[in-house]
């Protein structure tokens, strides 16, 4: 006899004596291959007994204060004959009444993997606050350092790949080919050739996102459970096919837009000045000078200047912005003079020229939270004074000192990770990885979410096949065709960048996509095509070749880049892009800032984006294509550019899928009443033996009160 017990919040629930409670369990169902997080759910009813009314706090009575909150699931577990069986959550759906009296509570029991969706909800990747530990300064120096792998903080979770958001790169070694976008390094071009540094954006290691999920979703942070992933696929630095994957931090098309800047610091104006004199200045001795941004007043005792001389005015007029950028000004003098002014932005008179100025050297400091620029003439000192000459004639005039070059505050522009990471739900990110790598998940006895590839999950079974001949109901069984689909299509959702679109137009197939039927045959099946779609962008990258037609220069470069535009050559939004960054050495390339002539960098090492784990298949044959595609990097080299044969389909899906389409595959349905000792230890990767034939478990549905189990089994095949 089997006794089922349900506990909610540690309290045992009364059950109907004749209630049939069954659970369906499956890891991967042949009928729905792309479905992930497949732990069971089961709805059943319990009586409105005094015990249950206490547990559910008479939910039918809405007048009760502090009653049962049915908006959230509650911790629960099942026991069979006082032995723990399954942990999960319950949700109260409704209360059934008879003659206006509570009679039945209708509840649903959820397995722990299903609960993952409830914990994550609709949270976006941008909600993972700890990712901001990887935020970086966004400027010429930092970007060029991170392109070369010179991370100042030795952080290898962030880098900058050669992916441009708008502008095309070419390579033309002709010394006369001075044009923007040509990254070849040769003399005489200055900043006329090269690519702007702000065409590039940072990228983040996918494992860092997994870690951030674990750090956020904890009981200590107020969540219902700790999300902890095993180290079977995630959290394993030796698993290069995942650990080396990065996501391009591209939140919007085109330039980086950020509201985040580093802490505002004072910036001292130290530039030279243009002078303008007025009035009788030429007939008077000087009492002021200007050097390295500092104004010096030097009026000697006995000089025939009037007592109210000099009068000094300071005006600041930054480059117009909308809205205005507030800024602070601090004027300090060697004589102890200090003036601090907080402004709302725009044109401001800081010193009004009313009181005479004392001797001393005065300097200006300005700070703002956002980068602020003062064009030439935007910082202006006016020194005005009167002088009596030897004929006692009063002369008046003065001099203006205007900044000669543009001055900028030193607010540091920050590339904030949570502001720049693509807009994507965390659950969609995880589901996408599960679909891409054919992963499966279950919760172990320690509450760890074990994540493995399906093949490794089945391979982990070390038990001998479980023989159930003596327990099955021989009066009825079915053997069905196991072919659920005509064909299965594997593709990335995002195939909208220029070269990927061109590939589709030429070959009538998606870049990196594949369709599978055994031996490319078309079969009759009860349903149409089945689609496995990974919700990421998949680019075709471009290796640069020297456009110089002179014989000595024709050939490959070591530069490969991504041109993230659509087929109209316009900036493209797309889906979250994942790729392998490979640090390559060789051909020199130039990165510039067309607005700052001194910002020029020559790079001979750089992170190039790739769809393969390595550039040479002798190192690794792994790719993130669903099918074997030609290597963009090896396309024009001698040898076989199709040598990256370890595609996603080949290594993650083929073993399972080719069995599905085999003429020898059968779906066998049998019933059995298993002893508890077998049922307790039964795992979904165990093999079942019937009549000396072995089977994989497709699904099993068990009536927990009677012990009757309905098996769907797939016969094992040897290829």
Residues covered by each model-derived region:
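Short beta-strand-centered aromatic/proline hotspots
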Residues: 86-95, 693-703
């Amino acid at each position: 006899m089997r006794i089922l017990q349900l506990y909610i919040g540690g309290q045992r629930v009364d059950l109907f004596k004749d209630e049939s409670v069954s659970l369906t369990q499956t890891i991967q169902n042949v009928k729905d291959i792309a479905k992930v997080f497949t732990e069971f759910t089961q709805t059943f009813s319990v009586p409105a007994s005094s015990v249950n009314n206490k547990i559910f706090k008479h939910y039918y009575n809405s007048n009760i204060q502090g009653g049962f909150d049915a908006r959230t699931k509650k911790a629960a577990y099942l026991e069979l004959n006082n032995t723990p069986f399954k942990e999960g959550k319950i949700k109260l759906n409704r209360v059934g009444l008879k003659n206006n009296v509570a009679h039945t509570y209708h509840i649903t029991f959820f397995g722990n993997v299903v609960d993952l969706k409830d914990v994550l909800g609709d949270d976006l990747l941008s909600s993972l606050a700890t990712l901001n530990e990887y935020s970086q300064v966004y400027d010429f120096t930092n970007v060029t350092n991170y392109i070369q792998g010179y991370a100042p903080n030795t952080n290898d979770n962030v880098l900058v790949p050669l992916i441009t958001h708008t502008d095309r790169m070419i390579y033309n070694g002709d010394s006369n080919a001075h044009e923007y976008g040509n990254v070849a390094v040769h003399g005489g071009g200055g900043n006329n050739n090269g690519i702007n540094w702000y065409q590039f954006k940072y990228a983040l290691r996918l494992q860092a996102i997994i870690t951030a999920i674990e750090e956020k979703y904890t009981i200590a942070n107020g969540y219902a459970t700790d999300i902890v992933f095993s180290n079977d696929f995630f959290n394993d630095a030796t698993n290069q096919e995942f650990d080396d994957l990065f996501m391009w931090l591209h939140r919007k098309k085109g330039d980086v837009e950020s509201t985040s800047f580093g802490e505002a610091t004072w910036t001292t104006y130290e530039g030279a000045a243009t002078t303008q004199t007025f009035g009788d200045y030429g007939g008077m001795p000087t009492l002021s000078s200007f050097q390295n941004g500092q104004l010096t007043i030097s009026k000697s005792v006995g000089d025939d200047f009037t007592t109210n001389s000099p009068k000094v005015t300071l005006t600041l007029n930054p480059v117009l912005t909308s809205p205005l950028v507030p800024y602070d000004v601090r004027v300090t003098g060697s004589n102890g003079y200090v003036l601090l002014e907080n402004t709302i932005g725009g044109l401001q008179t800081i010193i009004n020229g009313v009181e005479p100025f004392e001797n001393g050297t005065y300097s200006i400091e300005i700070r703002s939270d956002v980068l602020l620029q003062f064009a030439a003439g935007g910082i202006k000192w006016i020194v005005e004074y009167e002088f009596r000459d030897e004929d006692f004639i009063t002369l008046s005039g003065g001099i203006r000192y205007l900044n000669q070059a543009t001055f900028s505050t030193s607010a540091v522009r920050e590339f904030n990770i949570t502001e720049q990471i693509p807009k994507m739900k965390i659950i969609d990110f995880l589901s996408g990885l599960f679909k891409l790598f054919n992963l499966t998940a279950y919760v172990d006895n320690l509450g760890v979410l074990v994540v493995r590839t399906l093949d490794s999950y089945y391979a982990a079974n070390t038990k001998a096949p479980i023989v159930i001949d003596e327990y099955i109901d021989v009066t009825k069984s079915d053997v069905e065709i196991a072919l659920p689909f005509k064909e299965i299509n594997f593709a990335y959702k995002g195939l909208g960048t220029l070269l990927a679109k061109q590939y589709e137009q030429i070959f009538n197939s998606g870049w990196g996509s594949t369709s599978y039927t055994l031996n490319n045959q078309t079969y009759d099946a009860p349903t149409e095509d089945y689609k496995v779609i990974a919700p990421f962008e998949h680019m075709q990258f471009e290796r640069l070749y020297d456009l110089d037609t002179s014989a000595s220069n024709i050939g490959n470069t070591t530069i490969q880049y991504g041109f993230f535009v659509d087929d109209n050559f316009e900036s493209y939004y797309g889906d979250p892009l994942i790729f392998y960054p490979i640090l390559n050495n060789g051909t020199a390339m130039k990165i510039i800032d067309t607005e700052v002539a001194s910002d020029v960098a020559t790079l001979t090492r750089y992170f190039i984006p790739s769809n393969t784990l390595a550039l040479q298949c002798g190192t690794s044959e792994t790719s993130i294509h669903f099918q074997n595609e030609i290597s963009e990097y090896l396309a024009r080299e001698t040898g076989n550019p199709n040598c990256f044969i370890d595609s996603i389909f080949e290594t993650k899906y083929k073993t399972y899928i080719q069995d599905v389409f085999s003429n020898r595959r059968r779906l066998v349905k049998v019933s059995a009443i298993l002893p508890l000792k077998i049922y307790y230890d039964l795992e979904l990767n165990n093999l079942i033996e019937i009549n000396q034939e072995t089977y994989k478990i497709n699904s099993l549905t068990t009536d927990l009160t009677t012990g009757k189990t309905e098996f769907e089994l797939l016969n094992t095949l040897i290829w």
